Protein backbone atom coordinates (compact mmCIF):
# COMPACT_ATOMS: atom_id res chain seq x y z
CA UNK A 1 0.00 0.00 0.00
CA UNK A 2 1.40 3.40 -1.02
CA UNK A 3 1.21 6.10 1.64
CA UNK A 4 1.30 9.63 0.29
CA UNK A 5 2.34 12.57 2.43
CA UNK A 6 -0.32 14.85 0.94
CA UNK A 7 -3.90 13.91 0.07
CA UNK A 8 -7.08 15.80 -0.66
CA UNK A 9 -10.61 14.50 -0.26
CA UNK A 10 -12.89 14.78 -3.25
CA UNK A 11 -16.59 15.08 -2.46
CA UNK A 12 -18.39 14.99 -5.82
CA UNK A 13 -21.84 15.49 -4.27
CA UNK A 14 -23.34 16.92 -1.09
CA UNK A 15 -25.84 14.57 0.51
CA UNK A 16 -25.95 10.79 0.43
CA UNK A 17 -28.82 8.33 0.63
CA UNK A 18 -26.74 5.44 2.01
CA UNK A 19 -27.06 6.61 5.64
CA UNK A 20 -23.95 4.80 6.89
CA UNK A 21 -23.74 4.83 10.70
CA UNK A 22 -20.30 6.44 10.83
CA UNK A 23 -21.12 9.28 8.39
CA UNK A 24 -22.24 12.68 9.79
CA UNK A 25 -24.62 13.51 6.89
CA UNK A 26 -26.88 15.83 8.88
CA UNK A 27 -23.91 17.91 10.07
CA UNK A 28 -22.41 18.08 6.58
CA UNK A 29 -25.67 19.16 4.93
CA UNK A 30 -26.39 21.71 7.67
CA UNK A 31 -22.94 23.31 7.30
CA UNK A 32 -23.19 23.31 3.52
CA UNK A 33 -26.54 25.12 3.63
CA UNK A 34 -25.22 27.63 6.19
CA UNK A 35 -22.16 28.51 4.13
CA UNK A 36 -23.31 28.05 0.56
CA UNK A 37 -27.09 28.28 0.68
CA UNK A 38 -29.82 25.77 0.01
CA UNK A 39 -30.44 26.96 -3.54
CA UNK A 40 -26.99 25.90 -4.81
CA UNK A 41 -26.34 22.77 -6.82
CA UNK A 42 -25.06 19.86 -4.75
CA UNK A 43 -23.23 18.08 -7.60
CA UNK A 44 -19.68 18.86 -8.64
CA UNK A 45 -19.41 19.09 -12.42
CA UNK A 46 -16.63 17.53 -14.43
CA UNK A 47 -15.58 21.02 -15.53
CA UNK A 48 -15.31 22.24 -11.92
CA UNK A 49 -13.31 19.12 -11.05
CA UNK A 50 -10.91 19.75 -13.95
CA UNK A 51 -10.48 23.37 -12.84
CA UNK A 52 -9.67 22.30 -9.29
CA UNK A 53 -7.28 19.61 -10.49
CA UNK A 54 -5.40 22.11 -12.65
CA UNK A 55 -4.27 23.85 -9.45
CA UNK A 56 -3.19 20.67 -7.65
CA UNK A 57 0.37 19.27 -7.84
CA UNK A 58 0.65 15.69 -9.14
CA UNK A 59 2.23 14.43 -5.90
CA UNK A 60 -1.04 15.05 -4.04
CA UNK A 61 -3.24 11.96 -3.83
CA UNK A 62 -6.97 12.14 -4.51
CA UNK A 63 -9.29 10.42 -2.04
CA UNK A 64 -12.81 9.93 -3.35
CA UNK A 65 -14.24 9.27 0.09
CA UNK A 66 -15.62 12.57 1.33
CA UNK A 67 -18.88 11.77 3.17
CA UNK A 68 -20.74 10.63 0.08
CA UNK A 69 -21.15 7.68 -2.22
CA UNK A 70 -19.08 9.00 -5.16
CA UNK A 71 -21.17 7.27 -7.82
CA UNK A 72 -24.31 9.18 -6.81
CA UNK A 73 -22.77 11.85 -9.03
CA UNK A 74 -23.06 10.51 -12.59
CA UNK A 75 -19.89 12.38 -13.62
CA UNK A 76 -17.67 10.60 -11.07
CA UNK A 77 -16.46 7.90 -13.51
CA UNK A 78 -15.31 10.64 -15.88
CA UNK A 79 -13.61 12.47 -12.98
CA UNK A 80 -11.78 9.29 -11.96
CA UNK A 81 -10.67 8.57 -15.51
CA UNK A 82 -9.53 12.15 -16.10
CA UNK A 83 -7.55 12.24 -12.83
CA UNK A 84 -5.91 8.90 -13.62
CA UNK A 85 -4.99 10.03 -17.13
CA UNK A 86 -3.45 13.18 -15.62
CA UNK A 87 -1.21 11.03 -13.41
CA UNK A 88 -2.86 11.38 -10.00
CA UNK A 89 -2.87 8.60 -7.40
CA UNK A 90 -6.48 7.73 -6.49
CA UNK A 91 -8.12 6.15 -3.47
CA UNK A 92 -11.78 5.19 -3.93
CA UNK A 93 -14.13 4.30 -1.07
CA UNK A 94 -17.51 3.16 -2.39
CA UNK A 95 -20.61 1.03 -1.96
CA UNK A 96 -20.92 1.00 -5.78
CA UNK A 97 -24.42 2.48 -5.41
CA UNK A 98 -25.18 4.40 -8.60
CA UNK A 99 -22.44 2.70 -10.66
CA UNK A 100 -23.70 1.46 -14.02
CA UNK A 101 -22.06 -1.18 -16.19
CA UNK A 102 -21.09 1.50 -18.71
CA UNK A 103 -19.43 3.46 -15.86
CA UNK A 104 -17.53 0.36 -14.76
CA UNK A 105 -16.26 -0.12 -18.31
CA UNK A 106 -14.79 3.42 -18.18
CA UNK A 107 -12.90 2.89 -14.91
CA UNK A 108 -12.09 -0.84 -14.81
CA UNK A 109 -8.49 -0.34 -15.98
CA UNK A 110 -7.63 2.40 -13.48
CA UNK A 111 -4.79 1.34 -11.21
CA UNK A 112 -6.26 2.66 -7.94
CA UNK A 113 -3.83 3.31 -5.08
CA UNK A 114 -6.56 1.82 -2.87
CA UNK A 115 -10.06 0.58 -3.68
CA UNK A 116 -12.41 -0.04 -0.75
CA UNK A 117 -15.86 -1.51 -1.36
CA UNK A 118 -18.17 -1.59 1.65
CA UNK A 119 -21.82 -2.17 2.50
CA UNK A 120 -23.94 0.81 3.43
CA UNK A 121 -25.14 0.24 6.98
CA UNK A 122 -28.38 2.08 6.21
CA UNK A 123 -29.33 -0.52 3.60
CA UNK A 124 -29.99 -3.38 6.05
Report residues per predicted region.
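Conserved alpha-helical substructure of the radical SAM core
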Residues: 1-114
Amino acid sequence: MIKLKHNIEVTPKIGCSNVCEYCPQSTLIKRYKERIGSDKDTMMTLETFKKCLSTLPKHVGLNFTGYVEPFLNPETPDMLLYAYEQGYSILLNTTLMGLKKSDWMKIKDINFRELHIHLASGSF
